[in-house]
């Protein structure tokens, strides 16, 4: 496999996400008109995500049993897509009290690319798989590629190698029948249409990607027992706001006075452990 893929001026499929905007002469519009136009387009995103729910469900139901056996999720993307994967992965430890090694976001160009573009990083077809092997990836894990275009070589190369090694692959893309979807066991195609600013996939595509990532990780964590009722009982107590929130969860569950509930929480380090310990006597 070549380390860099050659770019072609003749795409093999139509990139809906890069078609001309439905709006023109943007620079002549008032601020209010621009905001209302963007909001109008954003309303299409939730509908596109709703249509993708059957595929999202298929992916989640395949992920959960793997994670119960010690599997992990790897997000892979470049640019905005990569940053969103890293963002979602980084929220799992504080929200659900899980180790940061459980859901891992990888971005073309590494951590430097979180803030600054790294030239040609997304065109490397082998680096993604190299990064996965550095994490000792195995067949209990899941690789989810994220790319609005569905053509990012860094992602496609990693997914292709993952499938060859019997690893479950999924993807999130804004175009149908993309090369990336062809490498996914379960592709999620979220067709949001052309962007307000032509080709600016950080807009509707990015919004939809974030929504789907939220849906995947939240539903997986609920299935893994990290939520009780509707509460984040395993959240990390990383600041006073969260200590207060956890204390009030305990009050609601056990009917204790505030100070006693807070002391119980701080003693055990999590809402769930505090409640379980109190009920156990």
Swiss-Prot record:
Keyword Cell membrane: no
Source organism, top-level taxon: Bacteria
Organism: Bacteroides fragilis (strain YCH46)
Biological role stated in the UniProt entry: Specifically catalyzes the cleavage of the D-lactyl ether substituent of MurNAc 6-phosphate, producing GlcNAc 6-phosphate and D-lactate.
UniProt xrefs under InterPro entries: Etherase_MurQ, Glucokinase_regulatory_CS, MURQ/GCKR, SIS_dom, SIS_dom_sf
Annotated active site: 91, 122
Protein EC: 4.2.1.126
Any further remark recorded for this protein: A lyase-type mechanism (elimination/hydration) is suggested for the cleavage of the lactyl ether bond of MurNAc 6-phosphate, with the formation of an alpha,beta-unsaturated aldehyde intermediate with (E)-stereochemistry, followed by the syn addition of water to give product.
Family in the record: Belongs to the GCKR-like family. MurNAc-6-P etherase subfamily.
GO biological process: amino sugar catabolic process; N-acetylmuramic acid catabolic process; peptidoglycan turnover
Catalytic activity as recorded in UniProt: N-acetyl-D-muramate 6-phosphate + H2O = N-acetyl-D-glucosamine 6-phosphate + (R)-lactate
Subunit (UniProt): Homodimer.
Any one GO molecular-function label of the UniProt entry: carbon-oxygen lyase activity
Domain SIS intervals: 63-226
Protein name: N-acetylmuramic acid 6-phosphate etherase
HAMAP family the UniProt entry points to: MurQ
Gene name of the record: murQ
Pfam families for the chain: GKRP_SIS_N
NCBIfam families in UniProt: N-acetylmuramic acid 6-phosphate etherase, PRK05441.1, PRK12570.1
Key words of the record: Carbohydrate metabolism, Lyase
